[in-house]
Amino acid sequence: MTMLLPLFILVGFIADYFVNAIAYHLSPLEDKTALTFRQVLVHFRQKKYAWHDTVPLILCVAAAIACALAPFTPIVTGALFLYFCFVLTLSVIDFRTQLLPDKLTLPLLWLGLVFNAQYGLIDLHDAVYGAVAGYGVLWCVYWGVWLVCHKEGLGYGDFKLLAAAGAWCGWQTLPMILLIASLGGIGYAIVSQLLQRRTITTIAFGPWLALGSMINLGYLAWISY
């Protein structure tokens, strides 16, 4: 697919545009009830961007280039890029609002089950067990923290995102996903605290779950090739 590299780069730019527009449209803390999705797209064409707004663009273009160079079948390549766009959109929303909307997490979960049922990188049984275990593990952590500390350590959106990751990657990958997510979250908290010189009380965990799941999904695709 290297001959199609310019086309894939263009796809990366287009994907970034829609990732940001959908993230804005679905962001729960924004009052956009009077805006249609088309008006949101117009808003993003006219918006002036800060330097940090280029991060999703860089990631989208990098992911598109990786897909162009990957030796996978078109179905697997398309599925990987679709998963990436979903979790990137969720990460943008979570960083901004610390919320993960059901309108993205639940379709992502069902898409994972359907993909593995038809073209799967893993057995459908492993995908179903992964979805159940992904939700259940963080549900237990949530209530464990609540009983001990009397406060919420996680959000319900994190449960659903890990369930979706389990549906795509299987239950066997959940420990590694959680390890990567935990290390990423801890590292981010430490760096943020050093740079801002104040105590960080909460962080968005969704982006780190997204990172861990994307790494594991890419690895599964590679060993299945």
Curated annotation (Swiss-Prot):
Record's subcellular location = Cell inner membrane
Instruction: Kindly report the protein's main subcellular placement as a broad class.
Output: membrane
Molecular function as annotated in GO: aspartic-type endopeptidase activity; peptidase activity; transferase activity
Q: Which InterPro entries match?
A: Peptidase_A24A_bac (IPR014032), Prepilin_IV_endopep_pep (IPR000045), Prepilin_peptidase/N-MTase (IPR050882)
One of its GO biological process terms is:
signal peptide processing
What drives induction of this protein's expression?
Answer: Silenced by the DNA-binding protein H-NS under standard growth conditions.
Q: Which GO cellular component terms are attached? A: plasma membrane
| Keyword set includes Zinc-finger | no
Q: Where are the transmembrane segments?
A: 3-23, 68-88, 104-124, 128-148, 175-195, 203-223
Query: What other facts are recorded?
Result: Part of a cryptic operon that encodes proteins involved in type II secretion machinery in other organisms, but is probably not expressed under laboratory conditions. However, GspO is functional when expressed from a stronger promoter.
Output this protein's name: Prepilin leader peptidase/N-methyltransferase
Q: Which species does this protein come from?
A: Escherichia coli (strain K12)
Q: What is the lineage of its organism?
A: Bacteria, Pseudomonadati, Pseudomonadota, Gammaproteobacteria, Enterobacterales
What is this protein's gene name? gspO
